[in-house]
Amino acid sequence: MSTRSVSSSSYRRMFGGPGTGSRPSSTRSYVTTSTRTYSLGSALRPSTSRSLYASSPGGAYATRSSAVRLRSSVPGVRLLQDSVDFSLADAINTEFKNTRTNEKVELQELNDRFANYIDKVRFLEQQNKILLAELEQLKGQGKSRLGDLYEEEMRELRRQVDQLTNDKARVEVERDNLAEDIMRLREKLQEEMLQREEAESTLQSFRQDVDNASLARLDLERKVESLQEEIAFLKKLHDEEIQELQAQIQDQHVQIDMDVSKPDLTAALRDVRQQYESVAAKNLQEAEEWYKSKFADLSEAANRNNDALRQAKQESNEYRRQVQSLTCEVDALKGTNESLERQMREMEENFAVEAANYQDTIGRLQDEIQNMKEEMARHLREYQDLLNVKMALDIEIATYRKLLEGEESRIALPLPNFSSLNLRETNLDSLPLVDTHSKRTLLIKTVETRDGQVINETSQHHDDLE
C-alpha cells in the first residue's frame, strides 16, 4: 500500500482548488516521502517511492515516480540457474505502463493547471501594475481634482456661511436699533398720553368752572332781573306814594288855605319826600353799582374761562393731532418691525436650511473621503495580499520547475529490458525467512516563512512496517 499526503495551497485557495485557507502572514511547507519495499521471495524486488511536496501557503502538488530495481542476489539466498517465469515481468511491465500513463495524464493536468496558473499570474501582475499605477498617482499627485473641487466647494460654502452670519448680525443690530426706537417712541407716547390725560382733566376742571360760572351768571342774571323788578316795583310804589302824598298835600293845602292857623305840612312832606328820594336814589345807585361790579366780574371770569377753554381746546386738538400722528407712526413702525421680524425669521429659516444642507454636504463629502480612504486601504491590503500570493506562487513555480526538471531527468533514464532477465531458482526451504512486510519511511519537513523569509524549518522521520 502507498500513502499520498496532499495539503491545500494558496493557489487552490485563490483559484478554486480544494483545500482550506491558511494565515496570510506565514507559510508552511511540508515534504512527505513515503518509501515502500516489497519482498517477493525471489531475486526480483520492485520498489516504489512516492514524494509529495507542499508549498506555502499550505498548497500541495504531487508527483510520483516509480522505478524498478532489480536485485541480482539476496544475502543468504541461493538462486536457481533456471529461467524465471516471464508472467511476473509482464505484470511488472503492465504496471509500469499504467503508471507511466497515469503519470502522463497527471503531468498533462499539471501542465494545464500550470498554464492556467501562469495566465492568472500574468493577469494578477497586470492588475498589480494597475493598482501600483493608481497608488503612485494617488501618492504622487497629492490632492486630486476631486479633492480640489471639494475644497473649493467647502470654501464657497464657508464664505456663504460667513456672509449669512454677517447679514444675520447686521439684521440683529438693525432689529435692536428698531427695538430701541420703538421703546423710545412708546415712552414718548406714554408721556403724551399722560399729558393728554392731564389736559383732559384740566379741561374737565375748566368745563366745571365754566359750568359753575354759567350757573353763577344765570343766578346773577336772575338776581338782576329780580332786583330790576324790585326796583320797578319800588319805583311804582314810590310813585304811588308820591301821588298819594301829593293828593294829601293838595287836600291839606286846601285845608291850610282854609285854616291859616294850622301848622305848615308842606315843608314836612317835602322833607319826607326828599328823604325817600335820597334813600331810593342811594339804593338804586348801590344796586346798579353792585350789579355792574358783579356783571364785570362775571364777564371777566367768563372771558377768562373762555380763553382757558379755547386754549384747552387748542391744546386738546394739538394733542389729538400728535396722538394721531404718533399712532400712525407707531403703526408704521409696528408694520416695519413685523416685516423685519418676518424677514429675519425667513432668513433664519433659510440659514438653518442652508446650514443643514451644508452640513449634509460636508458629511457626505467626509463620508466620500472616508470611503476613498477605506478603498485605498483596501487596495493596499489587496496589493499586500497579492504580493504575498505572488511570493507564494513564485515559490511554487520554483518548486514546479525543480519537479519538472527532476521528471525530465527521470524520463531521460534508460528502461531495463525485463525479457532478458535470467534468474536462478532459489531453494526457498533453505532460505532464511525474509520479511514480507513493506517498509514505509515517512519524512515530514515543516518550513515556516513570513514575508518571503524562512523563519522556522523542522524535519521528522517516521518508519512504519506493514
From Swiss-Prot:
Modification sites for Phosphotyrosine: 53, 61, 117
Carbohydrate attachment residues: 7, 33-34
Domain IF rod: 103-411
Top-level taxon: Eukaryota
Span list, region Coil 1A: 96-131
Signal sequence, renumbered to the chain: none
Region (Coil 2): 269-407
Glycyl lysine isopeptide (Lys-Gly) (interchain with G-Cter in SUMO2) cross-link, chain position(s): 104, 120, 129, 139, 223, 262, 294, 313, 373, 439, 445
Any one GO cellular component localisation term in the record: cytoplasm
UniProt keyword list: Acetylation, Cell membrane, Coiled coil, Cytoplasm, Cytoskeleton, Glycoprotein, Intermediate filament, Isopeptide bond, Membrane, Nucleus, Phosphoprotein, S-nitrosylation, Ubl conjugation
UniProt xrefs under PROSITE patterns: IF_ROD_1 (PS00226), IF_ROD_2 (PS51842)
Transmembrane stretches, start-end: none
Coiled-coil portions: 96-131, 154-245, 303-407
Principal cellular location given in the protein's record: cytoplasm
Record region (Tail): 408-466
Domain description: The central alpha-helical coiled-coil IF rod domain mediates elementary homodimerization. The [IL]-x-C-x-x-[DE] motif is a proposed target motif for cysteine S-nitrosylation mediated by the iNOS-S100A8/A9 transnitrosylase complex.
This protein's name: Vimentin
Organism: Canis lupus familiaris (Dog)
Gene name of the encoded protein: VIM
